[in-house]
């Protein structure tokens, strides 16, 4: 079973590390090509392209400039511990045991605009380059054209390595668009999280993102290997709704939080 999640814009390079183990990202040659393109942009151009403040644009211009491919624990950090958005609040990798990291390293993949596909223990240097950004490059007008089949091929490699044909899609649409489902040698299962608001169940972005992290953690902690095992997920009040599920979707609901 291979779990896909999105990265986060918020990064943490300060907290104490809970593991000293690390691996190197497998697609750094591609990352270097993107860095080459990104370095051509001035801070104001970055700000406009990404829709961010001058301060953030300056920070990311500096990050692109400082980026270099010789990753070490001194200048980089394991991806699963560097990302700090809502998904990662639910995942809480800072409380993982070494055995949890082992399982995650095999079964969890983070999709990334700059790094393509990251394993949990892959070192990464700080960056901001969302998959939906229209960064022109030698292969086309945006990152989807840049990555082409590369991400899908990498995921197929991971599936073959574990002798498995199930993908659990917990990534956002923006990131999942970088995957070509028809070329993926897998059955794709998409958990959907609905929260009750004014008597109606719907996707509430903040809660749904955190729930994707909670589900990832649930799979990792319990060493789950079959999609039907996911239906027992009940973290933070969610419950499986069999009637609402179907067509590759597992629907989980939660009553209004008081």
From Swiss-Prot:
One Gene Ontology term from the biological process aspect of the record: response to hydroperoxide
Disulfide bonds: none
One cellular component (GO) term of this entry: cytosol
Domain of life: Bacteria
Protein family membership: Belongs to the UPF0246 family.
NCBIfam families per the UniProt record, alphabetical: PRK02101.1-1, PRK02101.1-3
Protein's UniProt name: UPF0246 protein CKO_03380
Gene source species: Citrobacter koseri (strain ATCC BAA-895 / CDC 4225-83 / SGSC4696)
């Amino acid at each position: 079973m291979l779990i896909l999640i999105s990265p986060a814009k918020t990064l943490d390079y300060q907290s104490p590390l809970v593991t000293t183990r690390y691996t190197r990202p497998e697609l750094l040659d591609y990352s270097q090509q993107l860095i080459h393109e990104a370095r051509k942009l001035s801070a104001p151009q970055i700000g406009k392209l990404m829709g961010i403040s001058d301060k953030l644009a300056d920070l990311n211009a500096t990050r692109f400039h400082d980026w270099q491919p010789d990753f070490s624990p001194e200048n980089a950090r394991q991806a699963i511990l560097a990302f700090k958005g809502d998904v990662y609040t639910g995942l809480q990798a800072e409380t993982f045991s070494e055995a949890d990291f082992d399982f995650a390293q095999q079964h969890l993949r983070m999709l990334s605009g700059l790094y393509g596909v990251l394993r949990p223990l892959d070192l990464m240097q700080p960056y901001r380059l969302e998959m939906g950004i229209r960064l022109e490059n030698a292969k086309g007008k945006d990152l989807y054209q840049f990555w082409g089949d590369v991400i899908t091929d990498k995921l197929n490699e991971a599936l073959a390595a574990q002798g498995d044909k199930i993908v659990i899609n917990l990534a956002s649409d923006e990131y999942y668009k970088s995957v070509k489902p028809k070329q993926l040698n897998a059955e794709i299962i998409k958990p959907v999280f609905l929260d009750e608001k004014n008597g109606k169940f719907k996707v509430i972005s903040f809660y749904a993102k955190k729930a994707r992290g909670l589900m990832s953690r649930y799979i990792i902690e319990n060493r789950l290997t079959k999609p039907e095992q996911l239906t027992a997920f009940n973290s933070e009040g969610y419950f499986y709704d069999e009637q609402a599920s179907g067509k590759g979707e597992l629907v989980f609901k939660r009553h209004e939080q008081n």
